[in-house]
UniProtKB/Swiss-Prot annotation:
Entry GO CC: cytosol; ribonucleoprotein complex
Record's subcellular location: Cytoplasm
One Pfam family, short name: EFG_IV
Keywords on record: Cytoplasm, Elongation factor, GTP-binding, Nucleotide-binding, Protein biosynthesis
InterPro entries: EFG_II (IPR041095), EFG_III/V (IPR035647), EFG_V-like (IPR000640), EFTu-like_2 (IPR004161), G_TR_CS (IPR031157), P-loop_NTPase (IPR027417), Ribosomal_Su5_D2-typ_SF (IPR020568), Ribsml_uS5_D2-typ_fold_subgr (IPR014721)
Chain's role: Catalyzes the GTP-dependent ribosomal translocation step during translation elongation. During this step, the ribosome changes from the pre-translocational (PRE) to the post-translocational (POST) state as the newly formed A-site-bound peptidyl-tRNA and P-site-bound deacylated tRNA move to the P and E sites, respectively. Catalyzes the coordinated movement of the two tRNA molecules, the mRNA and conformational changes in the ribosome.
Binding sites annotated in the UniProt record for GTP: 26-33, 104-108, 158-161
Modified residues (Diphthamide): 699
Species of provenance: Lachancea kluyveri (strain ATCC 58438 / CBS 3082 / BCRC 21498 / NBRC 1685 / JCM 7257 / NCYC 543 / NRRL Y-12651)
Protein family according to the UniProt entry: Belongs to the TRAFAC class translation factor GTPase superfamily. Classic translation factor GTPase family. EF-G/EF-2 subfamily.
Protein name: Elongation factor 2
Highest taxon above the source species: Eukaryota
Length: 842
């Protein structure tokens, strides 16, 4: 047992070259938390007997009950390497003790915002893949997120015990299934990799892939076996590693290596990987599971495994676990892989700095981040808030990218909307104290230097969810995180007892702090709305709200889906609107924006903050826009960054720039609440064709222009074939063959469209992918389990907005029904106003 003290960890924090910040990411139920256990156990925090069952990083009660991870949890581990291994590390190191900051993240797609928060503060990722199920939809999503943050992956193929015990595969089959998994991971990596990272594909022969079983607590990399055999055969370890994977065969008669499958007589040879790596494992499994009492001691002696007194009495799975743990301890393989192949903060920040920092790449803050310099000004990014045991207070959880954070230090707390040189969204306050996050516990420390992950007390009142802490006055913010999911499911929350209202408001504030991807706001009709990414996410949020954050009984409305309003054609005539004092007129037309441009805006490829000339170049080259139009984009809306645009197509209008601010403000308002049923607009482009303004400045103030622009936008919108869009989930369902029929019948009832259906080679499992409207997804999981006898497991992730083909203005159609119901709920008049209501005659 390595019992270590906080002082030891603190002293290691200064050796930046010996730190590894990494997160564990994977598809749901591929065994992240279970695998993390074996690492935690090595650090001496939980006993060996519990490892694999304790799921130490699942700290919440509901996480233990449901058996899923909901929040990402951080823990620091201490590890030592032999001098021989340290020599093989490709980057600078000092000494042979290492500090590993590990974050166990959720795999369930509803919580992928937690994964984003975890990835931002780490430099490497351990991607866990299930041998039997292979690479799934969520594996791809999290890998894509990681590579987008320039994070280097290593892979662990987990649940090998399932392949051996449940499926009883042969050695060659297992090799093929490993090879397939490796290949599909590399395909994803090469698709999304960033040139700056270099080649980050994973190769078993280089030791960047481990194979093992988290439940049984064993794992190996090819390097470990190469170590054993290179001593025995007297060969160089590097050469041995290359031979233990791929098409290389060893001929025991001639004692020669070949890359042909047969020897000279045409007899088939056994693949080196099967012979040297899998064979001992298969033999142990068969001897122990078939209770061959006489073979076991011989095998153990050969493999140099010593059992203690009472361990000799065990049999079956219990014995198997102990033997495999002694033969190939999981922690050794994983720690070796993490330390040798993942970058230290010094290495990583060098290439991640430009992507993390919003300002220019030559200002002092960016240079300090690049060098990971503990003596520079402080730059710290808070990626999420963690609730403390004391109700209502939070630790700010983040990473020091430069400088050193000390208890009691005065810092500038910059929220996400802070602009250098202004005073908005900025507080200057002292950090009360710094703590080290250890799963369920925290340990106070005095200070924390660059490259480490830390929790801060006393900052929570000044930040909503994320932000930058710095001591350098000219510092820009660290870039805001891009979430791959968006909150599309909403419910209205009311209190049962009117006296509890203030508690609800306070609780909603705390809820929106504690979860990076939940939205809380108040609607026009005075309801409190909570929006989440899916059914499960919402359920957990509301349960937290009721039990922890507000602590009062609540009434919750049935879930409602967020829609978008859009147009399909160009306005059939020019929309004209006059100001209230009849002295100003705005003429405009609305038209649709191509889906790919909307997606590019939503993904941040076309950015409102970019230089307008560069942006116009991109839009002209990649999306076929007219350059003059692209240069004259006045604003994005709603919220200044949505997928709707105002383009100035006027010619020689006097005083035009004076009304620009008013027009922008009006468009933000109009695009946030569309004319059909008060939902946000999407993919609408408004071209201002002409403006007539009064010569006297007093008659063309905001009060005249804003309502005019809004009315004109609505009129143009309603003249351009308005439609509504509904959000659509991509569902991936894994199931055995006999359950496929049940899936189709449920999908048909729910307006789902099947996209693909394929069988995983070497397994009886089928993977069905389908599009399912979010509106129909409530209770989908339950119905699916009923129809398939509990054999199908759906994973739903928001995929795209789909336009409903029917006319939303006609109450008899499907779209019209949705509109009427929503207008009733919002307390508006039931029929949608016609364009005439917003259009003014000359």
């Amino acid at each position: 047992m390595v019992a270590f003290t906080v002082d030891q960890i603190r002293s290691l924090m200064d050796k930046v070259t010996n730190i590894r910040n990494m997160s564990v990411i994977a598809h749901v139920d591929h065994g992240k938390s279970t695998l993390t256990d074996s690492l935690v156990q090595r650090a001496g925090i939980i006993s060996a007997a519990k490892a694999g069952e304790a799921r130490f990083t699942d700290t919440r009660k509901d996480e233990q009950e449901r058996g899923i991870t909901i929040k990402s949890t951080a823990i620091s581990l201490f590890s030592e390497m032999s001098d021989d291994d340290v020599k093989d590390i490709k980057q600078k190191t000092e000494g042979n003790s290492f500090l590993i900051n590990l974050i166990d993240s959720p795999g369930h797609v509803d919580f992928s915002s937690e994964v984003t928060a975890a990835l931002r503060v780490t430099d490497g990722a351990l991607v866990v893949v299930d041998t039997v199920e292979g690479v799934c939809v969520q594996t791809e999503t999290v890998l894509r997120q990681a590579l987008g943050e320039r994070i280097k992956p290593v892979v662990c193929v987990n649940k090998v015990d399932r392949a051996l015990l449940e499926l009883q595969v042969s050695k060659e089959d297992l090799y093929q299934s490993f090879a397939r998994t490796v290949e599909s991971v590399n395909v994803i990596i090469s698709t999304y990799a960033d040139e700056v990272l270099g080649d980050v594909q994973v190769y078993p022969s280089k030791g960047t892939i481990a194979f093992g079983s988290g439940l049984h607590g064993w794992a190996f990399t090819i390097r470990q076996f190469a170590n054993r055999y290179s001593k025995k055969f007297g060969v160089d370890r590097e050469k041995m590693m290359e031979r233990l994977w791929g098409d290389s065969y060893f001929n025991p008669k001639t004692k020669k290596w070949t890359n042909k499958e047969t020897d000279t007589d045409g007899k088939p040879l056994e693949r080196a990987f099967n012979m040297f790596v899998l064979d001992p494992i298969f033999r142990l499994f068969s001897a122990i599971m078939n209770f061959k009492k006489d073979e076991i001691p011989v095998l153990l002696e050969k493999l140099e495994i010593n059992l203690k007194g009472e361990e000799k009495e065990l049999e079956g799975k219990a014995l198997l676990k102990i033997v495999m743990r002694k033969f190939l301890p999981a922690a050794d393989a994983l720690l070796e892989m993490i330390i040798m192949h993942l970058p230290s903060p010094v290495t990583a920040q060098n290439y991640r700095a430009e992507q993390l920092y919003e300002g220019p790449s030559d200002d002092p803050a960016c240079i300090a981040i690049k060098n990971c310099d503990p003596k520079a000004d402080l730059m710290l990014y808070v990626s999420k808030m963690v609730p403390t045991s004391d109700k209502g207070r939070f630790y700010a959880f983040g990473r020091v990218f430069a400088g050193t954070v000390k208890s009691g230090q005065k810092v500038r707390i910059q929220g996400p909307n802070y602009i250098p040189g202004k005073k908005d969204d900025l507080f200057i306050k002292a950090v009360q104290r710094a703590v080290l996050m250890m799963g369920r516990f925290v340990e106070p420390i005095d200070d924390c230097p660059a490259g480490n992950i830390v929790g801060l007390v006393g900052v929570d009142q000044f930040l909503l969810k994320t932000g930058t802490l710095t001591t350098f006055e000219g510092a820009h913010n660290m870039k805001v995180m891009k979430f791959s999911v968006s909150p599309v499911v909403q419910v209205a929350v009311e209190v049962k007892n009117a006296n509890d209202l203030p508690k609800l408001v306070e609780g909603l504030k705390r809820l929106s702090k504690s979860d990076p991807c939940v939205l809380t706001y108040m609607s026009e009709s005075g309801e409190h709305i909570v929006a989440g990414t899916g059914e499960l996410h919402l359920e957990i949020c509301l349960q937290d709200l009721e039990n922890d954050h507000a602590g009062i009984p609540l009434k919750i409305s049935p879930p409602v889906v967020a829609y978008r309003e859009t147009v399909e054609g160009e306005s059939s005539q020019v929309a004209l609107s006059k100001s209230p004092n009849k002295h100003n007129r705005i003429y405009l037309k609305a038209e649709p924006i191509d889906e790919e441009v909307s997606l590019a805006i939503e993904a941040g490829k076309i950015n409102p903050r970019d230089d307008f000339k560069a942006r116009a170049r991109v839009m002209a080259d990649d999306f076929g826009w007219d350059v003059t139009d692209a240069r004259k984009i006045w604003c994005f809306g709603p919220d200044g960054n949505g997928p709707n645009l105002v383009v100035d197509q006027t010619k020689a209008v006097q005083y035009l720039n004076e009304i620009k601010d008013s027009v922008v403000a009006a468009f933000q308002w109009a695009s946030k609440e569309g004319p059909i049923f008060g939902e946000q607009m999407r993919s609408v482009r408004v071209n201002i064709l002409d403006v007539t303004l009064h010569a006297d400045a007093i008659h063309r103030g905001g009060g005249q222009i804003i309502p005019t622009m809004r009315r004109a936008t609505y009129a143009g919108f309603l003249l351009a074939e308005p439609k509504i869009q509904e959000p659509v989930f991509l569902v991936e369902i894994q199931c055995p063959e006999q359950a496929v029929g049940g899936i189709y019948s449920v999908l048909n009832r729910k307006r789902g469209q099947v996209v693909s259906e394929e069988q995983r080679p070497g397994t009886p499992l089928f993977t069905v992918k389908a599009y399912l409207p979010v509106n129909e997804s409530f209770g989908f999981t339950g119905e699916l389990r009923q129809a398939t006898g509990g054999q199908a497991f759906p994973q739903m992730v928001f995929d795209h907005w789909a336009t409903l083909g029917t006319d939303p203005l006609d109450p008899t159609t499907k779209a019209g029904e949705i509109v009427t119901a929503a207008r009733k709920r919002h307390g508006m008049k039931e029929e949608v106003p016609g364009w005439q209501e917003y259009y003014d005659k000359l």
